[in-house]
Amino acid sequence: LSFFEIVIYYATVALNHFPTIQRGEKNMLEILELEQEDEKPPSFAQSKDSWLVAVLANIKDERIELPPDVPEDALADFDHIETIRAIQAAIETDGHRTVFIQADSNLPYALKQIKPDICFNIAEGLGGDGREAQVPGLLEMLRIPYTGSRVVTNAISLDKTLTKRIWRDRRLPVAPFQEFLTGDEPLRPEMRFPLFVKPAREGTGMGVDTGAIVNNEAEARERAKWVIRTYRQPALVEQYLPGREFTVAVMGRPDSKLYSRHPEWYDVDGFHRFPIMELDSSCSITPGIYGKAAKSKDIGEEGAPDFYCPARVDDELAKKLQYYAWRGHNLLGALDISRVDIRLDAKGQPCLIEINTLPGLTPDFSDLCVIAKAEGITYKELILEILYLGASRWGMLEARELTPALKKGAGSRVMYRR
């Protein structure tokens, strides 16, 4: 079996520990065949004040033992059932009904049976280099509204190399990088040691530990070949950035204030500027590396990084970080919410690392939730804001009239001129 086939098998076993709907016995052709009555897109009454919201996710079960040829972090992107319950509880406080549906191979049939008004999507997908686009693609085929970024953006954002190429070509700062398919490719002359090697199409710090930093060509090739062999995908090799690390959340779009429950949160461009979070991993279980081991630690736990939110930065650096995150979000066509990771180079200049269009939503643990809490935004408010931003894109909400004060927005637009 291939790596992805093994992951899919064990993920499905894990998911079966959490049944939420009756499995259907129809084959896939019957599942995907749309009845004539379903040919029309869903119609939503503007006055409708209660929806059936399906929360879509992949659930991890740490009781499942993976085979020895599969990396121990293979299911790191998946969510715990407690996170799903927290999202459901937040949505239900506003009068909606919720149901959790596992994002496995039975998802098409489940959606046809349950007929949700909208899906709150945090599903990572099962296998493949575009797995985060699998569920959005299915939802668009079935014409079911959903939250978050759409198909193309979710496919691109998981591919770190492609994301960096887009950012670089649009003059956003990224460290020099190169993708290795075999590990034997000639090293480009602009690649100066130390370098940093990681899987090109993974998230949650998978494949990232202290061994990711390499100091010579032999180490670089050995690490790249290990990544390619272990994760069955290309290795991304990039200039190591020794400076401070930040994560910047981006929420909204140009017309956010017309539909948001909190229009006062948004600037004149329709985006909310969360406080910047700094991640200090110098004291973590993997010093200087914010990888899987460090990310799995609770805040304050021994071996966890130190977090500072708001970050301890001057106004000039704050403007750069906010602008680059906002620009990176928009260039990829991200919607509703994202989180952009940025690190400083040896000269103290910011370089974009990657974007997460499906940021974690575990209360009091995930970076986005900690950032929101630091600003005084409750978990319930965050979840409902994401839900309503998504719903408004599908015609499920009426636009409001903006007062002069709301038109002005929460501060000036995000701008930085180099």
Model-derived segments and spans:
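Alpha-helix N-cap recognition
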Residues: 103, 215-217, 378
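Short phosphate-binding/catalytic loops that engage adenosine nucleotides
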Residues: 96, 144, 172, 232, ...
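Short acidic/His/Gly/Ser-rich catalytic and metal-binding motifs that mark active-site loops
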Residues: 62-67, 203-206, 299-301, 362-363
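ATP-binding N-terminal substructure of ATP-dependent carboxylate-amine bond-forming enzymes
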Residues: 3-146, 152, 157-158, 162, ...
